[in-house]
Structures are given as structure tokens and as C-alpha cells.
């Protein structure tokens, strides 16, 4: 049987990319694989080995994509990574740039330009390619986003563009890291159905890298478990399902009690009204994002913000976090102060702990992880002043709460994407904020870490004067403390 990929006793040439033992693996024609395992277990290193990203000692992987295949491995394999959902790899990007459109270079590509370039790699003839393009655009409902600069898209909109870009080139093998993150329920169902059809028709083969065992779809034929830097043997999906018993581990009692007894950073909260918006409208060009929104968040309330991709959730959070310059033209008060009344952005941010998909993109400096965590105390991206020993002790304590002890000195960019997300969550908590603003905080986390973080959020919010605003597309991710919900509708 045809072997699309074959590796025999593979060992990465560079020590920092090595797994614990040599890897032997074959991907046969007709197989669709799920790669599963805990955060930091080695899944990304295994995929890098499959794609030939890192040279091996001895023989490199062999590839056979069949007659008529393209000459380059990279043309036959498309790999959508977790971090791709945060944008193009642009070193000039900064966290608030999405909300400062006047500073965007016109050379920055639009979504349409990026997708049109992908059409050049399509295996089908021109007419079939255009038909396929129209089908994907309609299925994922992206027409309204095509002429937006790529860095202006929400994380969910950007995720759709990345997926469509890969599908337009019709690769022989498509690898997707956490395919459903950032997508609303409708888009997840559409993608799941489309991938199932493509696998059934033999149009491509699929490797899904999954943090959630319950997201292994029925069109997956085999599963490879990667844990403790070991690649286990490939097994049939039914065999894996019969032996798999995934469950999140509750927060250890010791950690829960330590968190409840943690000294407060401030003796008093700043205001009874944390957020107040009156008739707030936000527009970009001809498109209305928020229209006449009235919203009040009081001290100690815990809000879920829901809505489909592109409904304005991230825009709303940019107003709460003082990142959006349009807030000065709106009737918005934060922590009892009207925007534009003389308070600085940093006067507002010192009360807020924040994490989001966009933040993940902004962290490209390969600093020690504890420095990334410590930057949350100064609200900087990166580390611009040396933390004191007391601040470092506080960072170590919070890393222990989140189970990241031992990662303090590891370079941030050497962590797995799930571990990076945990580190950015620690950064949000490290100054014991009055207000937690969490935009899809459980992205890419395995079952155990999802439960742990959910318990930490719940326990943190049991403390006095703690307010929460949380965005998610998965209702099961919301902690029990949620007592209010705001649902946004996408404006046409």
C-alpha cells in the first residue's frame, strides 16, 4: 500500500527538537490521523518531523504523494498551526494595532489578496478552482471580510481565512492544529462536515492535532497518542476510544485554599460601576460593529459575552481594556471615570488582567517565561524593566497555581502553544486584578489544564470584589460563577 509519509527511527539533528526516543511512523493511503496528548507532550515536535521542518540524523522522511503530485513537499502538505489563527508573521505588529486603523500600512494584504494568491496553487483547472472558491466563501460566510486588512480580522474570522487558504490549494495532505478553536458553533459544524466529505471522497488526507479527546471526529481512522515526549504506536480509532478515559483533574485543595487566602493587592475596589456604556456605536468604514449598546457591569459581577464570529466581541473588549481610540467619542466610563476625563490608559489597565488570541500573536520575543509573566505587573508586551525579587516570587507563586512550575527559565517561544497560553493566563492574574477580561482563555488547552484553569477562574471570583468578563464559543467552558450574559449579534 502507498506510504504517503514514512519515518524509520527518526531523531532530530538538533537536540532542542528531539523527542525522548526515535520515531517510526507510516501514513498509508486512505488513513486520516488524530494526534492527541497533553500540552507540552511533544505533539508539535512530531508534526514538525512529519513535515520535514527539522532535519534528522540519518535518513529524512520519505514521501510518496502519488502520480501527478507537485514536486515540493510543501506544496503537497499544508499545515495550519495554532498560532496561525493570530495572524501573519509580521514583526512590526503590536497588540493595539487592530484598533488603530490609521497606522496600518496599505501594503498590508487584505483577506481577498491572501486567498487569491492561494488559488495559484490549486490542483484543479481554473473553472473548478473558481467554483471551489465560491463554495468555500459561501459556506464560511466570509464575503463581508474579504476586503479587510488581514490584521483587522477577529481571531475567528482569521481562522476561517487560514482554513480556506489551505483548502483552496487542494493539498494531498492537510494538517490542522486544533481545527475548531476560535470558531463559533455554526462554523465548527460546517468545517467538520466539509472535512468529512473531503476525506470520504478521497480528495485529501487529514491529520488533526487535538487537545480535546472528545473532538476526534468519526472520519478519523487512526489515533497517535504523544505524551511525555514519546510518540506511541498508531492505533485504530475504535481501539483508542475503548481505552481512553479523558477527564479533567480538579484544582488541588492545597492550591484552592492558597488562592482563597491570597493577600489582596489593594485594600479597596476602585468603583461600584466597573464598566458603563451608554448608546455606544462603533463603525469602521461602512460597517457597523456595535450599534447603540447600553451595558453596565458592576463590581463583583461575572459576565459571559457570546456571539458568532464577527459579532463585535473583541471590539467590545477593546473598549473595556482602553485599547480602542474610538472610545473617546463614546459615552464610556471605566472604574467610575468617564473616558477622556484625564485618566491615562495605564490608570485603567492597572485594574485589569487580560488575555486574548491577539495577545498571543504579540508575544514574539524569546524571553524567559517568568519575564513574560512579570510583564503583566507593568502592562508591557515583553519586559522593559527588571522585576524585583518580591515580584519574581509573586510570579513563581502564580506559576505554581497554574501548574507551570519548572517553566520559569524556559524561553517562551520554546514552550508548546498550550503552555504559552497558560503562561499568558498567569500574566493576566499576576497582579491580582479587580477585573479579569478573558477572551477565549481555554484555547488549545488539554482536558486537564482546561479543568484546572476553569477551577482557578471560579475560585478567584469567589474572592471579594472580583469582576469577570469572559468570551467563549463553548458554553461548557464557562465557570459556575457566571451570573450575567451579554449576547452580541453581527450587524449586516
What residue ranges belong to the model's regions?
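ABC ATPase nucleotide-binding domain signature region
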Residues: 44-121, 317-381
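ABC-family nucleotide-binding domains
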Residues: 177, 183-184, 188, 439, ...
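Conserved ABC ATPase signature
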Residues: 149-153, 384-387, 411-415, 419
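Walker B catalytic motif
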Residues: 149, 178-180, 411, 440-441
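Conserved ABC ATPase "signature" region
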Residues: 128-145, 389-407
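Hydrophobic anchor residue at the start of the ABC signature
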Residues: 162-163, 425
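Conserved beta-strand-loop-alpha-helix hinge in the C-terminal portion
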Residues: 228-258, 479-480, 488-492
Amino acid at each position: 500500500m502507498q506510504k504517503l509519509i514514512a519515518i524509520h527511527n527518526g531523531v532530530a539533528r538538533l537536540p532542542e527538537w528531539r523527542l525522548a526516543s526515535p520515531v517510526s511512523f507510516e501514513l498509508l493511503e486512505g488513513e486520516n490521523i488524530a494526534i492527541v496528548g497533553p500540552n507540552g507532550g511533544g505533539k508539535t515536535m512530531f508534526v514538525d518531523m512529519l513535515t520535514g521542518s527539522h532535519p534528522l540524523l540519518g535518513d529524512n522522511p520519505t514521501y510518496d504523494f502519488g502520480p501527478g503530485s507537485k514536486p515540493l513537499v510543501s506544496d503537497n502538505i499544508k499545515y495550519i498551526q495554532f498560532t496561525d489563527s493570530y495572524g501573519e508573521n509580521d514583526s512590526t505588529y503590536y497588540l493595539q494595532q487592530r484598533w488603530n486603523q490609521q497606522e496600518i500600512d496599505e501594503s498590508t494584504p487584505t483577506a481577498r489578496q491572501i486567498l487569491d494568491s492561494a488559488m495559484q496553487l490549486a490542483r484543479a483547472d481554473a473553472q473548478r478552482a473558481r467554483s471551489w472558491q465560491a463554495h468555500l466563501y459561501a459556506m464560511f460566510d466570509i464575503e463581508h471580510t474579504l476586503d479587510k486588512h488581514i490584521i483587522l480580522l477577529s481571531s475567528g474570522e482569521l481562522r476561517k481565512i487560514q482554513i480556506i487558504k489551505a483548502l483552496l490549494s487542494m493539498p494531498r495532505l492537510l494538517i490542522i492544529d486544533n481545527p475548531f478553536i476560535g470558531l463559533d458553533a455554526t462554523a465548527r459544524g460546517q468545517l467538520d462536515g466539509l472535512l468529512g466529505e473531503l476525506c470520504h471522497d478521497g480528495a485529501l488526507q487529514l491529520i488533526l492535532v487535538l487537545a480535546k479527546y472528545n473532538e476526534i471526529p468519526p472520519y478519523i481512522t487512526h489515533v497517535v497518542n504523544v505524551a511525555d515526549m514519546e510518540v506511541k504506536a498508531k492505533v485504530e480509532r475504535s481501539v483508542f476510544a475503548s481505552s481512553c478515559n479523558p477527564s479533567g483533574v480538579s484544582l488541588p485543595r492545597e492550591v484552592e485554599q492558597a488562592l482563597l487566602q491570597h493577600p489582596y493587592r489593594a485594600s479597596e475596589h476602585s468603583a461600584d460601576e466597573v464598566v458603563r456604556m451608554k448608546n455606544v456605536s462603533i463603525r469602521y468604514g461602512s460597517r457597523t460593529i456595535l450599534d447603540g449598546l447600553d451595558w453596565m457591569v458592576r463590581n463583583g459581577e461575572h459576565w459571559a459575552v457570546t456571539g458568532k464570529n464577527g459579532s463585535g466581541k473583541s471590539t467590545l473588549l477593546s473598549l473595556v481594556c482602553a485599547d480602542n481610540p474610538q472610545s473617546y467619542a463614546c459615552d464610556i466610563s471605566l472604574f467610575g471615570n468617564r473616558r477622556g476625563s484625564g485618566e491615562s490608559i495605564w490608570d485603567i489597565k492597572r485594574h485589569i488582567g487580560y488575555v486574548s488570541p491577539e495577545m498571543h500573536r504579540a508575544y514574539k520575543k524569546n524571553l524567559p517565561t517568568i519575564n513574560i509573566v512579570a510583564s503583566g505587573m507593568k502592562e508591557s508586551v515583553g519586559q522593559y524593566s527588571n522585576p524585583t525579587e518580591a515580584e519574581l516570587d509573586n510570579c513563581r507563586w502564580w506559576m505554581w497555581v497554574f501548574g507551570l512550575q519548572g517553566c520559569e527559565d524556559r524561553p517562551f517561544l520554546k514552550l508548546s502553544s498550550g503552555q504559552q497560553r497558560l503562561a499568558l493566563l498567569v500574566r493576566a492574574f499576576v497582579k491580582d486584578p479587580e477585573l479579569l477580561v478573558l477572551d477565549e482563555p481555554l484555547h488549545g488547552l488539554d482536558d486537564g489544564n482546561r479543568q484546572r484553569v476553569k477551577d482557578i477562574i471560579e475560585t478567584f471570583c469567589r474572592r471579594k470584589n472580583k469582576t469577570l468578563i469572559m468570551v467563549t464559543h463553548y458554553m461548557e467552558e464557562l465557570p459556575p460563577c457566571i451570573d450575567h450574559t451579554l449576547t452580541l449579534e453581527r450587524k449586516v
